Amino acid sequence: MKKNNLKKIAKNVIDLEIQALKKLKNSINNSFNKTVSLISNCQSKVIFCGVGKSFIIASKISSTLSSVGSPSFAISASQCTHGDLGSITKKDLLILISNSGETEELKPVIQYAKRNKIILVGIVSKKNSVLYKSSDVKLYIPESKESGHGIVPTSSTTSQLALGDALAIASMNYKNFGKLDFKKFHPSGNLATKLKTVGDLMISGNKLPFVTENSNM
């Protein structure tokens, strides 16, 4: 394969994902507002669940939410039927992510949520799917063409991640979560360094060492 073809492939992949994001942007409706409200007012945990690539996306969204003031974690639907359903309580908000909405591993999780009256938000691209029909709040991601012969999760996972980022940032604004709040949950790394103030580094009071001209070396 010629190197120029590789560049063409890269640009095509990015173009497909840009198109998917434009579709997603135009699809944002009141279900988004409802989900932000549920996340921001949740008195327990926001739990994300998915399978395969969707679980990886779920983990990233969950991590972002936790860092901006909404306690969250992600669990793999594959593990739920082996005891992890016990992690989900009635006070939690459950958000399931699936492109098809028909993933077999998700069905017991949906049944558990319904049986225990746990609020269920579905992030899904198929309106005729079990997940879409079962969700209390439906976050629809328009179907888009995937790269790699149209079968590799690319455009769909990019859209899922973008929607998750939008939920997290909107929740930040909803809760008036500012830079100082963010610093409390992120005390290390380059981001924390940028947010440090003089007061964080300054030594004052009894901790400030003083010597006189007569002090011994």
Model regions and ranges:
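Short, compositionally biased "basic patch" segments
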Residues: M1-V13, V51-S59, T193
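An N-terminal, well-structured beta->alpha segment
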Residues: K2-S44
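Short, basic/glycine-rich phosphate-binding loops at helix/coil junctions
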Residues: K11-L16, I61, L65, K194-I203
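Alpha-helical scaffold segments in soluble metabolic enzymes
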Residues: L16, K23, K34, L38-N41, ...
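Short, glycine-rich nucleotide/cofactor-binding loops
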Residues: A20-L21, K25-I28, L96-E102, V211-N214
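Glycine-rich phosphate-binding loops that contact phosphosugars or nucleotide phosphates
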Residues: S44-K175
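A short, charged, Gly/Pro-tolerant segment at domain boundaries
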Residues: G178-A192
